[in-house]
Design a protein with these regions (language model features):
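Peripheral, non-AAA+ core regions of ATP-driven protein-machinery
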Residues: 1-106
Length: 106
């Protein structure tokens, strides 16, 4: 994965360095670039990535805030679309999901 895998790579590192399972029992996929301040940036081809994630069994997809309009066209694919602006918000959203809450959505 190139820069569009930045969000998920960052979350994987956080998951390994912290206690517990960041995503609980949920199959979480997502995409987005990460800048040095932790801002999640938009990517191209999000609908293709969403289709691949859904076909792989994902039930949650982390969406860069700037890609939400395009991602909404895929709502019928059965995944919860979680809107993220930065890495901290992505971590918070996963904690909300694992506790049964509803994080910000697209």
């Amino acid at each position: 994965g190139g820069p569009s895998a930045g969000l998920m790579f960052s979350l994987a590192v956080i998951d390994k360095l912290t206690t517990g399972d960041l995503n609980g029992s949920k199959f979480v996929a997502g995409t987005g670039t990460i800048d040095p301040e932790g801002k999640v940036g938009p990517i191209g081809g999000i609908t293709h990535k969403m289709v691949a994630a859904q076909e792989a069994g994902a039930t949650v997809f982390l969406v860069p805030a700037d890609n939400c309009d395009e991602a909404r066209s895929m709502r019928d694919y059965g995944m919860e679309l979680v809107k993220v602006d930065n890495l901290g918000q992505a971590v918070d959203a996963l904690h909300i999901l694992t506790s049964g809450g509803r994080p910000p959505s697209c």
